[in-house]
Amino acid sequence: PLLVLDCRDNAVKMTVARKNKYFYDQKDSEAIEAIVKSYPFDTDIAETDVQHEAIVQYDCTDWDFIISRMEANGLICIADNGKIIAKKPDLSGETVLDAVFGATMLAFDAELDAKNQYQNLKATTWDYSNQSVITVDANEPGFEENGNISSSDLGNVLDIAEYDLVAGADVTEKELQ
């Protein structure tokens, strides 16, 4: 006989039912707080910047919606013992684990993929109210913790000088950035 025990956080309840919801005049963080409030969880949600006219959760689980909105804001989201935490990664803290190959780490398999790293990124949308095109050049993320290969070196691999993202929705310049 084999006993298989699958242990999960109570947040697994958020991963089952697909739902549809509308959030008006709210920030992403406020919409997430409203969703989590319907469950018996505590929260630690970092406040997001953009106030949306409307946010639509369409045919997706609460957890998938939370993850997608937090990812769009550059935040990570975890469930930890009945608490939903969403915040920017803090890389200034102390090292939690010193991995030494052969001692604390017996095997390591990693891949590096430059397919989605571009030299320059430009986002464009249509402003319905002013009947004009809005174009924003992306800022460098300033994230230098990805090893000894710079983002510009990775962007040069496929030799794509500029990549255009086009949004069909009416989004603000801040959201395009």
For every predicted segment, state its role.
Residues 1-177:
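Amphipathic alpha-helical and helix-coil boundary elements used as assembly
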